[in-house]
């Protein structure tokens, strides 16, 4: 009986509290705030004390400090939305007004980290589905979200050289913020036909085997095929050192944290990246979307790296090198995003927009009248199946392929580029008759030597004809002459790096084909630059070992 009286007393007191006027409780509870309509949240947020204004160097509307008023009717910039559903990396946001367009960046307000959401499709009824660029742990329904009214915007320019940034342009190298007033959105249109340069030019790298047999095109796309420990990283750093006088960008798409850290340290040791007061002399900017990042981050980090490179091309008017490692992980990340958005998969489980996703990025890598972006992309072939949709779609965009061979690496010949498997569209008579004939002559000699190796292994050199013996001797000299010491490897080998001009390279190999240097020992051709160094080394060897 006592318990019944206690319960009825509690109910009467609760009823009286619920009938009190709202002004008697000026501090609403969390439940009241959470259950309010988006319109009331927007009004309350708009009348709150203004937040601190963003720095002048930051792009407008990217700091999550909006006042709740729409500043652009077309994009809905400044509108405040509310998280209504969270499914892993997918976040649904509801707006009472100011619905953002696709690819607009939204920022979660008052969150423990800077969480950027990119708008995907609209779900109707003022709700948009977004992809998170970072982890959504700790995000709750009802959390406020600001419509920035613009795509993801990142810092660009010389301030990014020597720094590591993530997909949204935040520095992750613990060396302070990037101080610049230059920003660009990562979603941009490809250069128009009028702006593009139609003249094809060879991009001289100073690396003999590349320039002679598989030359790169300015503004072209190069596929870099190579396994572990065959010199891929050293080749990348040498290209940065030789070609990119001040501008190169490395985009690690789905990069292992350990690999990214190792590359950063190797670049510092080789002088590609400099710290402290000499940071302005750095030659490379690094953009990482690590393997443990959400798929949205890995799918967009390639665009972030490309945007940094585009600024150097368009504003600085320079030839930029863009390295993407790995291209397959970019496709994989977009496939994950497509599955999260509920799209029906296409062949072999890839997203139905595979060609569009890849083409949108590749078409921005081109030569304009101001400068060029030359892309070197590491290509992974799943199960060695060249008909797989991912590599097959990529091959359609490539202008050259550089294949690193483990067999050549085991011979101690570096760079370990396979001269027979590497190809280029630039190797045509139109690019230079002498260059073309010399390159084809070198490949013919090497192919004949490869065909004779089985006979040599079974019968020996003595059973070969005189012409075949001459072919083998010249091929072995050519094989060793294709080796070259790198500038970035000086600290490991002690040998000074060599840069060989294209004309000197062609003349030297033509001389070997013509038999001008048949009397020189093949050891004198190993790890040198031009033919003059070979002659000098042969004379030195003759003096040291007189016969």
Curated annotation (Swiss-Prot):
It is found in: Mitochondrion; Mitochondrion inner membrane. Keywords: ATP synthesis, ATP-binding, CF(1), Hydrogen ion transport, Ion transport, Membrane, Mitochondrion, Mitochondrion inner membrane, Nucleotide-binding, Transit peptide, Translocase, Transport. It comes from the Eukaryota. Residues 1-45 form a transit peptide. Residues 52-74 are annotated as: Disordered. Residues 52-62 have a biased composition (Low complexity). Its main location: mitochondrion. It is an enzyme of class 7 (translocase). One of its GO terms (biological process) is proton motive force-driven mitochondrial ATP synthesis. CDD domains: ATP-synt_F1_beta_C (cd18110), ATP-synt_F1_beta_N (cd18115), F1-ATPase_beta_CD (cd01133). Gene3D superfamilies: 2.40.10.170, Bovine Mitochondrial F1-atpase, Atp Synthase Beta Chain, Chain D, domain 3 (1.10.1140.10), P-loop containing nucleotide triphosphate hydrolases (3.40.50.300). NCBIfam families: atpD. F-type ATPases have 2 components, CF(1) - the catalytic core - and CF(0) - the membrane proton channel. CF(1) has five subunits: alpha(3), beta(3), gamma(1), delta(1), epsilon(1). CF(0) has three main subunits: a, b and c. This is ATP synthase subunit beta, mitochondrial. The lineage of its organism: Eukaryota, Viridiplantae, Streptophyta, Embryophyta, Tracheophyta.
């Amino acid at each position: 009986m006592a318990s019944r009286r206690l319960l009825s007393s509690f109910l009467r007191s609760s009823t009286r509290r619920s009938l009190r006027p709202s002004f008697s409780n000026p501090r609403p509870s969390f439940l009241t705030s959470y259950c309010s309509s988006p319109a009331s949240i927007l009004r309350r947020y708009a009348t709150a004390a203004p937040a601190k204004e963003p720095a002048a160097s930051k792009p407008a509307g990217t700091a999550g400090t909006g006042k709740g008023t729409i500043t652009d009717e077309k994009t809905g910039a400044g509108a405040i939305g509310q998280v209504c559903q969270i499914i892993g990396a997918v976040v649904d946001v509801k707006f009472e007004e100011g619905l953002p367009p696709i690819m607009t960046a939204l920022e979660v307000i008052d969150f423990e980290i800077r969480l950027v959401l990119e708008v995907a499709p609209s779900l109707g009824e003022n709700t948009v589905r977004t992809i998170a660029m970072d982890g959504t742990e700790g995000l709750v329904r009802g959390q406020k979200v600001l419509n920035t009214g613009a795509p993801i915007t990142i810092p660009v320019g010389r301030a990014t050289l020597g720094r590591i940034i993530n997909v949204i342009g935040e520095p992750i190298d613990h060396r302070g913020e990037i101080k610049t007033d230059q920003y660009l959105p990562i979603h941009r249109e490809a250069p128009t036909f009028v702006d593009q340069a139609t003249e094809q030019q060879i991009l001289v790298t100073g690396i003999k085997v590349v320039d002679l047999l598989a030359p790169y095109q300015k503004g072209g796309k190069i596929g870099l095929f190579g396994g572990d420990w065959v010199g891929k990283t050293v080749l990348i750093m040498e290209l940065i050192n030789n070609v990119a006088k001040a501008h190169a960008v490395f985009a690690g798409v789905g990069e292992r944290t350990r690999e990214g850290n190792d590359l950063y340290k190797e670049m510092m040791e080789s002088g590609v990246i400099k710290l402290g007061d000499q940071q302005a002399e750095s030659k490379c900017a690094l953009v990482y979307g690590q393997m443990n990042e959400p798929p949205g981050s890995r799918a967009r980090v390639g665009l972030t790296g490309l945007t940094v490179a585009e600024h150097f091309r368009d504003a600085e008017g320079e030839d930029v090198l863009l390295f993407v490692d790995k291209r397959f992980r970019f496709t994989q990340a977009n496939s994950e995003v497509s599955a999260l958005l509920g799209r029906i998969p296409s062949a072999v489980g890839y997203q139905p927009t595979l060609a569009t996703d890849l083409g949108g990025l590749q078409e921005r890598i081109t030569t304009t009248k101001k400068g060029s972006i030359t892309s070197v992309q590491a290509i992974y072939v799943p199960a060695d199946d060249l008909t797989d949709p991912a590599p097959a779609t990529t091959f359609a965009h490539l202008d050259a392929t550089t294949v690193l061979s483990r067999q050549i690496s085991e011979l101690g010949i570096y760079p370990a580029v396979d001269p027979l498997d590497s190809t280029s569209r630039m190797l045509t008579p139109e690019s230079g008759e002498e260059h073309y004939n010399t390159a084809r002559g070198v490949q013919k000699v090497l192919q004949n030597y490869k065909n004779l190796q089985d006979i040599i292994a079974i019968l020996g050199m003595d059973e070969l004809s005189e012409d075949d013996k001459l072919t083998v001797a010249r091929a072995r000299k050519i094989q060793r002459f294709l080796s070259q010491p790198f500038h970035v490897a000086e600290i490991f080998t002690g040998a000074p790096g060599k840069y060989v001009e294209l004309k000197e390279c062609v003349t030297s190999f033509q001389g070997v084909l013509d038999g001008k240097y048949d009397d020189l020992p093949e050891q004198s051709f190993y790890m040198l630059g031009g033919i003059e160094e070979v002659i000098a080394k042969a004379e030195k060897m003759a003096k040291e070992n007189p016969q």
